[in-house]
Amino acid sequence: MESLLGFLALLLLWGAVAEGPAKKVLTLEGDLVLGGLFPVHQKGGPAEECGPVNEHRGIQRLEAMLFALDRINRDPHLLPGVRLGAHILDSCSKDTHALEQALDFVRASLSRGADGSRHICPDGSYATHSDAPTAVTGVIGGSYSDVSIQVANLLRLFQIPQISYASTSAKLSDKSRYDYFARTVPPDFFQAKAMAEILRFFNWTYVSTVASEGDYGETGIEAFELEARARNICVATSEKVGRAMSRAAFEGVVRALLQKPSARVAVLFTRSEDARELLAATQRLNASFTWVASDGWGALESVVAGSERAAEGAITIELASYPISDFASYFQSLDPWNNSRNPWFREFWEERFHCSFRQRDCAAHSLRAVPFEQESKIMFVVNAVYAMAHALHNMHRALCPNTTHLCDAMRPVNGRRLYKDFVLNVKFDAPFRPADTDDEVRFDRFGDGIGRYNIFTYLRAGSGRYRYQKVGYWAEGLTLDTSFIPWASPSAGPLPASRCSEPCLQNEVKSVQPGEVCCWLCIPCQPYEYRLDEFTCADCGLGYWPNASLTGCFELPQEYIRWGDAWAVGPVTIACLGALATLFVLGVFVRHNATPVVKASGRELCYILLGGVFLCYCMTFVFIAKPSTAVCTLRRLGLGTAFSVCYSALLTKTNRIARIFGGAREGAQRPRFISPASQVAICLALISGQLLIVAAWLVVEAPGTGKETAPERREVVTLRCNHRDASMLGSLAYNVLLIALCTLYAFKTRKCPENFNEAKFIGFTMYTTCIIWLAFLPIFYVTSSDYRVQTTTMCVSVSLSGSVVLGCLFAPKLHIILFQPQKNVVSHRAPTSRFGSAAPRASANLGQGSGSQFVPTVCNGREVVDSTTSSL
C-alpha cells in the first residue's frame, strides 16, 4: 500500500515538474534539513497563481525561521555538531499551490520506504533519481489552516512531522487524520470561546457573523457558534467572503449585515485581506458596526489602513505574544546585498521602497530608515523552529549518546518516532522571552499549543490618529479593563446594544417561540406573582406577596383597625360621648328615682333599657379591638345581646301600654302581668331567647380568627373573626323580630291623646330604628370586601341605635327633671270615667310600684285610663 502511494506521488511529482515553470526555492545546506512553507506572496487573481509580496506574514515570518536557524546553529548546547539546513517554499496563500510546492518535501522520500529503506525495483536494483534532494526531516508551516490541512494530508503519508506557527483550525486537532501535525498556537475553539465570552461580557446576545471561505474561517465560525449557543447568544445572519470576491460582492455582504438592524455587532473569523476588504466596503457605504474580530485581523495596521473610521471601536483578538528585539535588529539590518540567500528579498525590497534594481535606485534605501512593525506571530515561528530543534536534540541524545554528529540511527531520521516520542514531549522555556515573562513551549496530547490571547480595541487617539490599545487578555478566562474602551467608559453613556429584543422589566417574563432564545415578547406578571425564572411567573398564594425584586414572596402583615386609625377615631369618639351620656342619664334617674316622672316611666325597664344602650356604645370598643378568640366571642355575644336588651325592654313597655289601653273596652279591669316584677321577667325572658341563639351559634361555629383575602385585593390580608356574615344575619334576625313587634305596638297606640306621650316617643324611636336598620343591613353586606368600611359602619349604626333610644325616650324626661321640675309632681284630676268607682280601684292597683293611677281618657276612639303624669 505504501509503495502504491509512493508511486502515485512520484507520478504527480514528475507531472508537476515537467509542466510547471521554474520556481524559487530557498535552500540552506545542513546535516538535517527542515522544510519551510510561508505565504511569501498574497493569493493571486483568477489569471495568476500569486499576487503581491506579503511583507508581514510572508517575508518577516520566513526571515524569522532563518533567524532561528542561525541562532540554533551557533548554539553550542543545542544540537552540537549537527547543522540544520532549510528548504523553504512559497505557498502564495493558496492551499492548492501550497500542495504543489510541498511535493518538494517528499521527493527525497520517494526513493525510500516509510522507514527510511530504499525502494527495490522489479529487477532487484535500487531506485535512483538524478536530482534527488536532501531528505526533509520536518516541516515548519504553513500559515493558513487550509494550507496546513492539505500539506498535512501529504506529509503524513511519508511520516514527516509538521509544526505550524499560525494554523488554528480545530480540525487539525484530530489525531486520527493529522497524526504528524503539531502547532505552537492554540486551536480556534479557544479563540472562539474567548470571543463568545467577550459578547456575553457586554451582553451582546444577537450578532451577525462573517467567515472567510476555507478551514480557518468556516471551522472557526462553527466553533464560535457552538460557544455562542452555550451562552444563549444568537446569530442573526451568517455571511461568507470568498477568495476572489469583487468590491461589489463585499458591499453586498455589508448590505446583508445591515438587513439585521438589531444585530449591531458583527463577529469576523476572516483572513486579514478579507477583513481589509470588508472594512473598505463598510466605509464606502458609510455603515457602522461594532466588530469583534479573530486573530486574522489581530492588531495589524494593514487591515485598517484607509478604513480607520469603519474600524473604530472594534475589539480584536490576537495570540498572546511578545516582540523579539533581536529579530527586529536582525531584520532591519537586512538588505538585498547581505541577504542573497532569500530569493524573494529583492522583490520585497522593490515593493517596499517602490524602486527598481534595473534602474539602480534601490541602494539608497534601508529598513532602518522606515517604521518597523514586527508581525505578531514571529514569536510562534521562532518557537516552532526551536521546538523541532529541541526534539531532534533529545532524539540525538537518545539514539546517538556517544557522538556529537549524526549516527546511523538518525540516517535518515525516523519521522514517526521523532513525532511521537520527541516532538509531542518537548518542553523548554521560550527563547528570547522577556525576563518578566513566564512562557513555556510545549504541546498537549493533541499537538496543540497553550491558549493565551491578547484583546485589543481600535480607537481614535489624540490629533485624530488611530491606534490599537490592549484592553485585556484571555487565558482560560476573560479579563477586561473597560476603562481603555471609549464607548464602554461610564461617561460615554449606555453601551452599544446588539440584541433581538429589549430586556424585560423586573415584573415581566419572556415569552419565546420554541427554539428561540434571543427574541421574545415581554409579558407582565400579575401583581401577586413573582418571577420563578426569566420565563415563568408564579403565584405567591393567598396571604403572600412578591418582594421588591420579585425573586420570592413574603407573608403579608395582617391588617386590622388600630386605635389610632382615622377609621377608629370617629366611632370611638361617638361611643365615648354616648357612653358618658348614658351614665349621666342613669345618674339623673337614680338621683330622682322617687319622682313621678321616673316612676311613671317604669323604672325597672328604664334601667334595663339604659343598660342595653350602654352595651351598644361598648360594642364599638369590642369591634375596634384587634380580633382574637376572646374578642370574637364578645362580638357575637355582645352585639345581639345589646340590641335584644334594648328592644326587649321596649317591646315589654309597648306591649304593656297596648294591653292597658286594649283592656279598656272590657272595663277598667287591671290587665295581667303589668306589675314591675312581671315586666322585668318578661323582658329577661325575651333577652334569654337571644342568649340561646348566640349560645347555639357559638357551639355550631366556634369563635376564632382567620386571615381573609379578597380576590380583587390580594395585597390586603385582613385579620377577621372567622364567622360568616350570613351567620351574623341569623343572630340579628331575632332582634329584627323584636323591632318589628315594637314597631307594630307603637303603630297601634299612635292615636293616644297628647297627654299620653310615652307611646308616641316609643313609636318615633322604633320608626327611626327601622330606618337605621334598613340602611345598615345593605351597607354591612355590600361593604364586606373592605373590613374598615364594614367595621366603621357597624360601630356607627350600633351607636346610632343606642342614641335614638337615648334621645327619643330619655331626653324629654331628662328635660322635665332638670329644667321643668314643677311638672314633676302628682296630678289630682277628678275621675271622669263612665266606669264610676272602678277607676280609683284600678288606679290603686296599677299604681303599685309605679306611683301612677288610672284616669279615663280616649285612645283610638275608645275610653281608656291614663296615668296621672299625663304631660309625659
Curated annotation (Swiss-Prot):
It is found in: Cell membrane; Synapse; Cell projection, Dendrite. Residues 19-567, 626-636, 701-725, 784-793 are extracellular. It is a multi-pass membrane protein. GO terms for molecular function: calcium channel regulator activity; group II metabotropic glutamate receptor activity; scaffold protein binding. Is widely distributed in the CNS and prominent expression is seen in Golgi cells of the cerebellum and some particular neuronal cells in other brain regions. Glycans are attached at N203, N286, N338, N402, N547. InterPro entries: ANF_lig-bd_rcpt, GPCR_3, GPCR_3_9-Cys_dom, GPCR_3_9-Cys_sf, GPCR_3_C, GPCR_3_CS, GPCR_3_mGluR2, GPCR_3_mtglu_rcpt. Residues 677-685 are annotated as: Important for interaction with HTR2A. GO terms for cellular component: astrocyte projection; axon; dendrite; glutamatergic synapse; neuron projection; plasma membrane; postsynaptic membrane; presynaptic membrane. The chain crosses the membrane at residues 568-590, 605-625, 637-655, 680-700, 726-747, 761-783, 794-819. Disulfide bonds join C50-C92, C234-C518, C355-C362, C400-C407, C500-C519, C504-C522, C525-C537, C540-C553, C632-C721. Its main location: membrane. The keyword Cell inner membrane does not apply. One of its GO terms (biological process) is cellular response to stress. It holds the Pfam family ANF_receptor. Forms heterodimers with GRM3 or GRM4. Interacts with GNAI1. Interacts with TAMALIN. Interacts with HTR2A. This is Metabotropic glutamate receptor 2. The gene is Grm2.
